[in-house]
A protein has these predicted regions:
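Extended, folded cores of ATP/NTP-driven motor/assembly subunits in large transport
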Residues: 1-309
Length: 309
């Protein structure tokens, strides 16, 4: 797990400023049905054994987005097939660095054990976007989307939970992995990533979003330095400001010592189902996992929920 964590960090380390990397994991409850292939005797026996059983289907999408190209819209409208030639020089350099960063990231991810990365076709993107908008209900149906305190799409209802501020994180350091407590004690110990309980371990329809925004390493470091100066000059006013000053100062020293790259991040999980009973079970489990891991969370509604969806 540590090695995968290191390779993930290295893969995205050289993305240019203004880049969003969005990892989206979709988990859907489905009934297992064997394919048309015959296979061996054992394969056919396994297929009969699992026929009709419930399982979780997992799809992982990795989105790369570059923001801030001022001349892109005009260039694309005037010539969709040759828009690069009409970009301003500064925007063209940003785009080239962005595409190079994607190639480097994918190359590193491809070398991770048991990992393959495939480009999505136009048809696949269109089908996925349509299915996602309808919360993976009837793909041929056109449904209404209603948003109040929760999300209603056709027969499906959804609830979302977001970790969108550093104050929502647990105090102290966060481990990249924890012990797997889902299995009975044995001679050996198993481990999994911290939030894996909201992945394949969560037996409900759900979507996990992890977004990293590369706002600019030097820009964010300068902001921390300014905040330290502000808190430092006012630290004698009360104990809270003094404590914040000491924590920021300690953080800055760790960043410099480890040469860490600073980014902004966002995490959310959305559970959905056509059954209110199943939705309540999923809701209870998500809250339990977040609370046990000492994460605070925001439950968006109305306008903010619409923006998330």
């Amino acid at each position: 797990i540590d090695e995968r964590d290191r390779m993930y960090r290295e893969a995205f380390r050289h993305m240019p400023d203004g880049t969003y990397v969005h990892k989206q994991d979709v988990f859907l409850k489905k009934d297992y049905h064997r394919g048309k292939g015959t296979g061996s005797f054992l394969d056919r026996a396994d297929a009969r054994h699992f026929e009709g059983r419930l399982y979780i289907d997992h799809t992982c999408i990795l989105h790369f987005v570059l923001a801030g190209l001022k001349s892109l819209e005009k260039a694309y409208v005037s010539s969709p097939l040759a828009y690069k030639e009409h970009l301003h020089r500064e925007d063209y350099k940003k785009l080239e660095a962005f595409l190079e960063g994607i190639d480097n990231a994918v190359s590193i991810l491809q070398n991770m054990r048991g990992t393959s990365v495939l480009p999505m076709s136009h048809e696949w993107i269109s089908a996925f976007t349509h299915a996602y908008s309808g919360l993976f209900g009837d793909t041929d149906a056109v449904v209404d989307i209603h948003i109040d305190g929760s999300l209603h799409v056709g027969k499906n209802h959804a609830r979302c939970y977001a970790v969108c501020d550093e104050t929502f994180l647990p105090e102290g350091s966060i481990e990249s992995y924890v012990r797997d407590e889902s299995l009975p004690p044995a001679a050996s110990q198993l481990y999994h990533p911290l939030m894996e309980q909201l992945g394949m371990y969560l037996p409900y329809n759900h979507i996990v979003n992890q977004v990293i925004y590369f706002e600019g390493n030097e820009k964010l470091r300068s902001r921390i330095a300014r905040n330290i100066d502000i808190y430092g000059s006012n630290s004698s006013m009360n104990k809270t400001i003094e404590r914040e000053f000491k924590e920021l100062d300690k953080l800055q020293k760790e960043i410099i010592e480890d040469n860490q790259m600073l980014v902004r991040s966002f995490f959310s999980v959305c559970v959905f189902d056509g059954s209110d009973t199943e939705l309540e079970k999923a809701d209870k489990r998500v809250r339990e996992v977040l609370n046990l891991n000492r994460f605070k969370y925001y439950i968006p509604g109305y306008e903010n929920l619409a923006k998330m969806h």
